UniProtKB/Swiss-Prot annotation:
The gene is ndk2. It is found in: Cytoplasm. Gene3D superfamilies: Nucleoside diphosphate kinase-like domain. One of its GO terms (cellular component) is cytoplasm. Its EC number is 2.7.4.6. Major role in the synthesis of nucleoside triphosphates other than ATP. The ATP gamma phosphate is transferred to the NDP beta phosphate via a ping-pong mechanism, using a phosphorylated active-site intermediate. ATP binds at residues 11, 59, 87, 93, 104, 114. Its cofactor is Mg(2+). Pfam families: NDK. This is Nucleoside diphosphate kinase 2.
Length: 143
């Protein structure tokens, strides 16, 4: 088992529907620890920079627009195999295809407004964490 860190964002739809606590509880029940967190209203520059990898794809403008509609909760999660564990808890990108009991099956409405974002690989997690957090803002947790 590998101790990893991953970035998780609770998106504007889930924040607006007051699902922050329920989503965090699922991460913690799965053994993931929050080692950094902040609520932030993304502006266009923030969203475009974070999702720059998708620039030029048909959904880019809608994604950037959606991510700036309200505040988001941004967290660094830490735990054994945190990246894959987080992705399992989130469920498939399309909530209609997400397994029952996953965050997206329970809280997302559409593939565009799908409640959460999670890093997909170790390299991506590192880049995404550094986009939102300085290293001194990430707190190691021993217990």
């Amino acid at each position: 088992m590998t101790l990893e860190r991953t970035l998780s964002i609770i998106k504007p739809d889930a924040v607006g529907n007051n699902h922050i606590g329920e989503i965090i509880a699922r991460f913690e029940k799965a053994g993931l620890r929050i080692v950094a967190a902040k609520m932030k209203q993304l502006d266009r520059k923030d969203a475009e920079g974070f999702y720059a990898v998708h620039k030029g794809r048909p959904f880019f403008e809608d994604l950037v627009g959606f991510m700036t509609t309200g505040p988001v909760m941004i967290m660094v999660l830490e735990g054994e195999n945190a990246i894959n564990k987080n992705r399992e808890i989130m469920g498939a990108t399309d909530p209609k295809k997400a397994a029952p009991g996953t965050i997206r099956a329970d809280f997302a409405q559409t593939i565009d407004e799908n409640a959460v974002h999670g890093s997909d690989a170790a390299e991506t997690a590192k880049t995404e964490i550094e986009y939102f957090f300085k290293s001194q803002d990430v707190c190691a947790r021993k217990r």
